Amino acid sequence: MSTPENPDPVDTTTQDAAAAIVAEEGTPPSESLRDEYEQLADLVRKYRYAYYQEDSPTVSDAEFDELYRRLEELEALHPELVSNDSPTQEVGGEVSSAFAAVEHLQRMYSLDDVFSLDELEAWVRKAEASVAKLGDSVPPIAWLTELKIDGLAVNLLYRDGKLVRAATRGDGTTGEDITHNVLTIKEIPRQLSGSGYPSEVEIRGEVFIPSKAFLEFNESLVAAGKAPLANPRNAAAGSLRQKDPAETAKRPLSMFVHGIGAREGLDAKSQSESYKLLEEWGLPVSPYLKVLETFDDVLKFIADYGERRHKLVHEIDGIVVKIDDFATQRALGYTSRVPRWAAAYKYPPEEVHTKLLDIAVNVGRTGRVTPFGLMEPVKVAGSTVGMATLHNQDVVKAKGVMIGDIVILRKAGDVIPEIVGPVLALRDKQEPPVREFVMPTECPSCGTPLAPAKESDVDIRCPNAKSCPSQLRERVFHVASRGAFDIEALGWEAAVALTQPAEPETPPLTSEARLFSLTREDLADVLIRREKRSKGVGTGEYELVPYFYTKGTAKSPSKPTATTEKLFAELEKAKQQPLWRVLVALSIRHVGPTASRALATAFGSMDAIRNATEEQMAHVDGVGPTIAVALKEWFAVDWHNEIVDSWAAAGVRMEDERDASVPRTLEGLTVVVTGTLPNFSRDEAKEAIIIRGGKASGSVSKNTSYLVAGESAGTKLDKAEQLGVPVLDEDGFRELLANGPAQTGTEAEAATDEATVVDETAAEAATE
């Protein structure tokens, strides 16, 4: 969720430009259209990463959906734009490197979203027409209709009734192993009840935090002086990604199961029948579902729950409609991303009225100045809202809102607060009279004159990137993020204490360059302003309190807190993070985890990247000209280089270890490793590929040179066989590493024969 403290609004320049593209079907895409398509795809990937990997969406659901649907429109007009790595061909998010990757026995798909009843009817009629073509081989359609829970999709693997693994959906094929955290959820049985369950079965469901429990948990956080969680969905996702299961156990998590993946010996003939079996086995099944015969019945179900969706146990963001019969589901099959037999209807956002008290601005990590509305708190979509982003001055103007207006407020996707516009009929009745918002001309944090980075930019920025306290605070917070150094003890409040404390006047950090050189003594006198609380409620009065040290008494002198000690331990550990994480931490525009991994693989060291030409970087697979320009511009700034040099002097690793004697046998090859190899861990296999000049990919495509298939190879093996990709076992992999592709022809054929008989549901948990 975007907040005034840490906003990341939609790049409306790109959005508006993309919306202005007019193309005719069959006309080859122009260069400008290709550029706009690539920008749109990059935005979708960026926002998807924030949602799935950082559990912190930076735009509303409605804004994301608008970008995504525009991407689909462009691909429909120009199918040649579609590639295997297009966001429209992928499911959900990537797999976080913070958890072990495990491969699902059967792929977990996403759902096709529809945003109006007309769209839902069109989908239903299309499904009915497809079923009609199947003739008498399938029964008449019955619609299993259920609530779309706003939580985190999870896959449970049971063997002989015992829970052996739990994983996130990830990219649909490979997820994160969160078994230890899932075991803390009391509704999930470690051993299935009764009898008749398959010897091996994957059970899919949604982990969520009940609405009432979420409010109570947030109240306890506030009472303890901690920041409340943004919303139940992000809270559930973040809870399952805690490194310590004891922390997860403190969160009020629940789960409802809603599907079955791979199974051996399941006797159910329909979705509804399988739900009855799941209940008999002791699994939690949602009580909010019905099997309906007609589309009119489905519409009544949608209307009924639309009226009372905020009175339910959990948050929902729509209704899922599925064809109930399994045989029909199998006959209709799947696209590359979604089943053809199910869709998710999303309710239009609920709207309420409230008063816009003020419009303030915040300065973000890149200097972007973002206005946000401060409103009289009002309950909307089940929670109280008093604040919403307005993105930029053009959005404020387009919405036509003025300070003092009664405004229409809604939650996009029932999650993200959004100001729709003013209630004009009430404008003249407001006291005091409404006034126009004027974007500041100087940075509210450092006083520097504001200006667009480029003449055509909609956003205005503070150019004082080096010294602006707000930008520094945001960059320090980013350094600690999961995708960068992953420093859990350096949260938002700690970043404020390091860069903008109430005391001393000169903060411990005036540049992130000193982060890894901090000492405990540097933090001894840091005080922050914290609101006094009475029975968990803010009093409006503030006091200065030490942040990094205990208060100290005559009997117990002030000393570093346990969290401070943890911070220094994690800073020391972070120095050994791989090069790609260091690159992410530097806040270089456009350079995220994917580009950083590609750069680290191609160049091996920070110095090599710093000294590379723009052309050399642009030719790296996964980088390209835009990122290459951004890198050269970043390294051309002296104080940026001071950060790199200071971190290096403090012991931060700036080079991935490589053995120069290792031959570059895999130069130009893309190799995918799947399943369990007896003598290689997943990371060891990837490293072996990279140091020999190859690209270690996580997905199989027509560009894959080889698939290395271990035990329990899973769906990647099936795809490789369909595409004719050579398959190697571990012996063939060793031969490839030693001698390159010229020596592996016969081994590849032999390995393919051997690998195809691997039973993908018979082995222990597969790892990528």
Curated annotation (Swiss-Prot):
Binding site for Zn(2+): C443, C446, C462, C468
Compositional bias annotation for Low complexity: 746-768
Biological process annotations from GO: DNA repair; DNA replication
Binding site for NAD(+): D61, A62, E63, F64, D65, S110, L111, E146, R169, E206, K322, K346
PROSITE patterns per the UniProt record, alphabetical: BRCT, DNA_LIGASE_N1, DNA_LIGASE_N2
Keywords: DNA damage, DNA repair, DNA replication, Ligase, Magnesium, Manganese, Metal-binding, NAD, Zinc
Family: Belongs to the NAD-dependent DNA ligase family. LigA subfamily.
Active site: K148
Xref: SUPFAM superfamilies: BRCT domain, DNA ligase/mRNA capping enzyme, catalytic domain, Nucleic acid-binding proteins, RuvA domain 2-like
Any single GO CC term annotated in Swiss-Prot or TrEMBL for this entry: cytosol
InterPro entries per record: BRCT_dom, BRCT_dom_sf, DisA/LigA_HHH, DNA_ligase, DNA_ligase_AS, DNA_ligase_CS, DNAligase_adenylation, DNAligase_N
Top-level class of the enzyme under EC nomenclature: ligase
Keyword Translocase: no
Domain BRCT: 661-750
CDD domains found in the cross-reference section: LIGANc
Protein name, UniProt field: DNA ligase
Function, in words: DNA ligase that catalyzes the formation of phosphodiester linkages between 5'-phosphoryl and 3'-hydroxyl groups in double-stranded DNA using NAD as a coenzyme and as the energy source for the reaction. It is essential for DNA replication and repair of damaged DNA.
